[in-house]
Swiss-Prot record:
Protein name: Glutathione exchanger 2
Organism of derivation: Saccharomyces cerevisiae (strain ATCC 204508 / S288c)
UniProtKB keywords: Antiport, Cell membrane, Ion transport, Membrane, Transmembrane, Transmembrane helix, Transport, Vacuole
Gene name in the database record: GEX2
Any GO BP: glutathione transmembrane transport
GO molecular function, one term: proton transmembrane transporter activity
Length: 615
């Protein structure tokens, strides 16, 4: 494997030696001379560093350090998603769990683009360190929060750090691997999920989050940064090694000659390069539309509140303003329409959106559903929630080797979507009661296989469709669509929950005070009313009713999910970091093979022509 993971280093070095000629062609190609050259130099630095990873020991070190970093991120995320439920429960606002999730996802939409674009300009490592600082700040604020608004504010900082570290870790692994082995490298940070599901439940039980959730979150302010140190030191060492090469010195000398512009020019460049106006418009728009859906419920008659209505209308207007800005004024639009017009780009992005939409709509309230309506312990519930990650992580090395052999991914994504349909059907059938244990486990296993076949495969397909200069941007857009799907999915599930659950609890319990407790603090409720009690049975029936609605919506959304998979292109995963030949405007030009619907249509035409000729 070692001889083919990164590709032919001699080709990379020869390309680097031609950098001066390319710069001369590009330096005056448009008004953004500073942006062109600075971005170009950072990408070339990555290519020189990539050549240093040709040695087997450095490849092993890269994968190992990514594993350690991924372990810190993944274990914290797994535990914190549970601790968030206990935090909202302590505020007696557990029903607003999805509101926190929506706020996280909305913030992610804008931050993904910022990280991806700045990483081309300032380098991956610098942005990785910035993301780590946000991560620590958010963790500290969340741990000290005494009310939901303060916890949500901490979630903004934490989520900026979380999505940044994930995105930049993906970009770092992509820079230093070939397309053929890209899947293997990217899954290295995911392998900790082989271990996490079996220890997270025990950790949660031992940590007693109902009383100690604040300290349980706070400890990650120093545990997580420790997990990032190995990969940070490795990149710094490889940068030191690269600085000793003639190519690096030549590139730095040329960079000093080409450096132009002062502070004002840099700020103007960043304003247009990041599309600050576009980011603000889409972030505020989504916040105005999605967050009120999880806040309004019939018990408080908030839908009759003029503030809720005005917020929704404002969000819709801002969204149309965003589209107009992107089409008419943005110099570097968040959604590069020319790039997105090719089905090799828009189809995988559609798959990404519906993949995360269906996941969040089905799993946003899965942990409380397991505890309240399926008689699972906190340990068992945590393991079931994390079972899909375990399945995907365990099978990922074998899947990555298969991908390296076949070098194609489209059929895998189609199979993953089909598995999602089966998974959602099982979640619909086994949505509550003592007989749901085995069915939910089966659904979780299939969900893991679906995630394995879809999620990272779509990232690699998109990276295979673009050049190195566009790789970070298109990866950032993919992450943005994933968070957009997550935001809307969490918002829809939250809206259904807040609109339906209170009435069902009032109806089945027949006691307004008891219904309020069951709705606002379900974990407290189940400790007072054991399994089999009439009150608990009434709550279980309410949960089953609401889950039926949520899973019906999720099952319906697998149809457009499957449709988008049919239109994807199927680029070959070559033994280089990206396709650089046969490109146009940063997009790889592939033979315009027909999508599967066109092929089916052609097949029916062929059959009809045969029948006519037979007559």
């Amino acid at each position: 494997m070692s001889s083919s993971v990164v590709g032919a280093s001699s080709n990379k070095k020869s390309g680097i030696r031609q950098s001066c000629e390319i710069i001369e062609r590009e330096r005056h190609s448009n008004d953004d001379t500073y942006s062109m050259t600075s971005t170009f130099f950072k990408l070339k630095e990555n290519e020189i560093m990539s050549a240093q990873f040709d040695s087997l020991k450095y490849k092993i070190l890269l994968i190992s350090t990514a594993f350690v970093c991924g372990f810190g991120i993944s274990l914290d995320y797994t535990l914190r998603s549970t601790y968030t439920g206990y935090a909202t429960n302590s505020y007696s606002e557990h029903s607003l769990l999805s509101t926190v999730q929506v706020i996280n996802a909305v913030v992610s939409v804008g931050s993904q683009v910022v990280y991806s674009r700045l990483s081309d300009h300032f380098g991956r490592l610098r942005l990785f360190l910035v993301a780590t600082i946000f991560y620590i700040m958010g963790t500290i604020i969340q741990s000290q929060a005494t009310r939901l608004t303060m916890y949500a504010a901490g979630s903004v900082f934490y989520n900026c750090g979380y999505v940044g570290t994930n995105l930049l870790l993906t970009l770092i692994l992509s820079d230093f691997s070939s397309l053929k082995w890209r899947m293997f490298y990217q899954y290295a940070s995911y392998w900790p999920y082989i271990i996490i599901p079996w220890i997270s439940g025990n950790i949660i039980t031992a940590a007693n989050p109902q009383k100690n959730w604040s300290w349980n979150i706070a400890m990650w302010a120093f545990i997580y940064p420790l997990s990032t140190l190995p990969i940070i030191f490795l990149i710094l060492y490889m940068k030191y090694k690269s600085s000793k090469t003639a190519e690096w010195r030549s590139l730095k000398e040329q960079a000093r000659k080409e450096r132009t512009g002062g502070l004002f020019e840099n700020l103007v460049f960043l304003f247009w390069k990041l599309d600050i106006v576009g980011i603000l418009l889409i972030t505020v728009s989504l916040g105005c539309i999605l967050v009120p859906l999880t806040l309004a419920n019939e018990t408080s008659q908030k839908w009759h509140n003029s503030k809720i209505i005005a917020t929704l209308v404002s969000g819709g207007c801002l969204f149309f303003i965003f589209l107009y800005w992107e089409a008419k004024f943005a110099k570097s639009p968040l959604l590069p329409f020319k790039l997105l017009s090719d089905r090799g780009i828009w189809a995988p992005l559609g798959v990404t959106f519906f993949n995360f939409f269906t996941f969040f709509i089905s799993c946003d309230y899965l942990y409380p559903v397991l505890l309240v309506s399926m008689k699972e312990s906190s340990t068992s519930a945590a393991r079931i929630v994390n079972l899909p990650d375990f399945v995907a992580a365990t099978a990922s090395p074998f899947y990555s080797l298969l991908v390296a052999k076949t070098r194609k991914l489209k059929l895998s994504v189609i199979g993953g979507c089909a598995a999602w349909m089966v998974c959602m059907g099982l979640f619909y059938k086994y949505r509550g009661g003592s007989g749901s244990h085995e069915g939910v486990i089966a659904a979780s296993v299939i969900m893991g296989l679906s995630g394995l076949l879809c999620s990272n495969s779509v990232i690699v397909i998109l990276q295979a469709m673009t050049t190195h200069s566009r790789m970070a941007v298109i990866t950032g857009i993919q992450y943005t669509f994933s968070k957009l799907g997550a935001a809307i999915g969490a918002s829809v599930s939250g809206a259904i929950w807040t609109q339906t659950m209170p009435n069902q609890l009032y109806k089945n319990l027949g006691n307004d005070t008891l219904a309020e407790i069951a709705y606002a603090s379900p974990y407290t409720f189940i400790s007072d009313y054991p399994w089999g009690s009439p009150e608990r049975d009434a709550v279980v029936e309410s949960y089953r009713y609401v889950q039926r609605i949520i899973m019906t919506v999720g099952l319906a959304c697998t149809v457009p999910f499957f449709t988008f998979t049919m239109f994807m292109r199927n680029p070959e995963l070559i033994d280089k970091a990206t396709h650089e030949e046969f490109t146009e405007d940063g997009l790889v030009v592939l033979p315009d093979e027909e999508n599967i619907f066109s092929q089916i249509k052609a097949l029916f035409r062929h059959n009809r022509s045969n029948k006519k000729s037979g007559c």
